[in-house]
Amino acid sequence: MEGEKNWIVVPTWRIPGRLEKWHSLVKYLKHRTKELQQVSYVPHHKVGWAWWTCSRVIFPLKEEAYLEVQGYWNLTPERGFLSSYAVRLTWYKRSFYTDVTPDVADQLLHGSYFSCFTANEVRRAIRGEKILSYCNYPSAHEGQVPSLQFLALRVIQEGKDGSQGESATRKQRRRNNRRSIRLARKNNNRAQQGSSQPLAPRTHFPGLAEVLGILA
């Protein structure tokens, strides 16, 4: 008698293409800039029995918690193993785990990775001094109710005066985002060859949804 099929259903976020850009960016930030040095990247050939998993990226967080971005492929075997891709975002601590949305995942990551404004920046701004720290993960603050201090620092960082639209600072940050991703895609061979070039500047991380190309 044929045994019953057991199905495991998990929430996933569909993406339009392959995951090379995501993998390259993780390796770039892990090995090149060292900003994700503690992150574990597990490629598909080391995953083991889960043949539908193309990668696992595990971010250690505070208080012994973890955020895992698990990439899936070949999700439509009944249609001939089409090249369909998706990701699953999971937060877990010891024996408890839960799936999270991309915006929550960004907030969790920003609590441990990519620098933000320090507590002294408000006093520096009031005294008219130069701001020494900036938020390199702006998308992690979306969906939150920001404080007036944070909004003021964001205005200073972005260089907006309320009438002239985008400043060179915001445009530069967008260029930095594109540059980080572009360098990540070309960095794999260079890193393997032991390049002696200096480390890249601190990265402005555009957020998981943008990097992965998550489709809402």
Swiss-Prot record:
A motif (BC-box-like motif) lies at residues 147-156. The modification Phosphothreonine is found at T98. A motif (HCCH motif) lies at residues 110-141. Residues 170-180 have a biased composition (Basic residues). One of its GO terms (biological process) is viral life cycle. Residues 161-180 are annotated as: Disordered. The modification Phosphoserine is found at S147. It is found in: Host cytoplasm; Host cell membrane; Virion. Keywords: AIDS, Host cell membrane, Host cytoplasm, Host membrane, Host-virus interaction, Membrane, Phosphoprotein, Ubl conjugation, Ubl conjugation pathway, Virion. GO terms for cellular component: host cell cytoplasm; host cell plasma membrane; membrane; virion component. Residues 154-168 are annotated as: Multimerization. InterPro entries: Vif (IPR000475). Highly phosphorylated on serine and threonine residues. Polyubiquitinated and degraded by the proteasome in the presence of APOBEC3G. It is a peripheral membrane protein. Induction: Expressed late during infection in a Rev-dependent manner. Counteracts the innate antiviral activity of APOBEC3G. Forms a complex with host APOBEC3G thus preventing the entry of this lethally hypermutating enzyme into progeny virions. Functions as an adapter molecule, recruiting APOBEC3G to the ubiquitin-proteasome machinery. Targets APOBEC3G for degradation through the assembly with elongin BC complex, CUL5 and RBX1. Binds viral RNA and affects the stability of viral nucleoprotein core. May play a role in viral morphology. Required for replication in 'nonpermissive' cells, including primary T-cells, macrophages and certain T-cell lines, but is dispensable for replication in 'permissive' cell lines, such as 293T cells. In nonpermissive cells, Vif-defective viruses can produce virions, but they fail to complete reverse transcription and cannot successfully infect new cells. Belongs to the primate lentivirus group Vif protein family. The BC-like-box motif mediates the interaction with elongin BC complex. Homomultimer; in vitro and presumably in vivo. Interacts with viral Pr55Gag precursor and human APOBEC3G. The interaction between Vif and APOBEC3G is species-specific, which may play a role in restricting the replication of HIV to humans. Forms an E3 ligase complex by interacting with human CUL5 and elongin BC complex (ELOB and ELOC). This is Virion infectivity factor. It comes from Human immunodeficiency virus type 2 subtype B (isolate UC1). The gene is vif.
